[in-house]
């Protein structure tokens, strides 16, 4: 096992404490070990992934897309409109839901999305990340840190459980994506308590229609 590899939350925390690094920094170094590539190249590729996520959110919120079958489309725009009108769940949560729906509709319309960790759950992570970015003024550097952190959480799930809906149902996909997104949002405050007993959570893959399971397990950040 190399210096920055981990398969559980406990191992991840131990590395963070030993090296004095954040989760995103550990994940970046892990990726360097796995890919034998430079941090600069890894971040460049990850930035391409980030921009693909952003484009899918923007496309779904500004265009009334329709699925190939015609059964769905336009819900993201309607939900986003309602988010500004005293939504029961609160404006921020409603905006995140709308942004997540936007990506799902781009996927259904055969657009370009990022499987995070799968195409079926592709909206959750970007929906949360970009909504929080708009609320908190996060720049690309902060968002890249978020993707690395989410990838670290995802790699734990991939190592211990499954991100496959066909194998374990929709919760394997959406539950994993939600854990990646939520833990990224609160990781600074409660990292130790949230991760100490964590033994499962998925991987970010490059822009594609479907995540490649085996590649994601071996290389949880960019496949």
Model-derived features: positions:
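Beta-strand segments within the central parallel beta-sheet cores of soluble alpha/beta enzyme folds
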Residues: 139-152, 190, 196, 203
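Intrinsic low-complexity, disordered N-terminal segments enriched in polar/charged/small residues
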Residues: 192-199, 208-211, 220
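A structural signal for small-residue-enriched, beta-sheet-centric alpha/beta enzyme cores
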Residues: 165-173, 177-178, 182-186, 196, ...
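Generic N-terminal targeting/processing segments that precede catalytic cores or assembly contacts
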Residues: 1-111, 135
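Acidic-glycine-rich active-site phosphate/pyrophosphate-binding loop
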Residues: 90-107, 142-162
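Conserved phosphate/anionic-ligand binding catalytic regions in large, soluble enzymes, centered on
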Residues: 110-128, 173-177
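Active-site-adjacent structural elements in folded domains
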Residues: 110-113, 163-169
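Alpha-helical support elements that line or immediately flank enzyme active sites
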Residues: 126-138, 182, 186-187
């Amino acid at each position: 096992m190399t210096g920055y590899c981990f398969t559980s939350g406990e191992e991840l925390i131990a590395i963070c404490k030993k090296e004095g690094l954040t989760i995103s920094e550990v994940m970046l170094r892990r990726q360097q070990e796995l890919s034998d590539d430079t941090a600069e190249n890894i971040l460049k590729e990850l930035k391409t992934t980030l921009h693909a996520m952003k484009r899918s959110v923007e496309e779904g919120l500004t265009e009334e897309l329709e699925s190939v079958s015609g059964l769905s489309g336009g819900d993201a725009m309607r939900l986003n409109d309602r988010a500004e009108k005293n939504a029961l769940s609160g404006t921020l949560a409603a905006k995140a839901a709308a942004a997540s729906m936007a990506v799902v509709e781009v996927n259904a319309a055969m657009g370009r999305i990022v499987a995070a960790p799968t195409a079926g759950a592709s909206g959750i992570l970007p929906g949360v990340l970009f909504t929080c970015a708009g609320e908190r003024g996060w720049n690309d550097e902060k968002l890249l840190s978020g993707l690395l952190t989410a990838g670290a959480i995802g790699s734990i799930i991939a190592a211990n459980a499954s991100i496959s809906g066909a194998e374990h149902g929709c919760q394997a996909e959406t539950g994993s994506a939600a854990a990646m997104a939520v833990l990224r949002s609160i990781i600074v405050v409660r990292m130790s308590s949230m991760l100490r007993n964590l033994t499962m959570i998925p991987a970010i893959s490059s822009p594609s229609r479907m995540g490649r399971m085996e590649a994601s397990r071996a290389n949880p950040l960019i496949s």
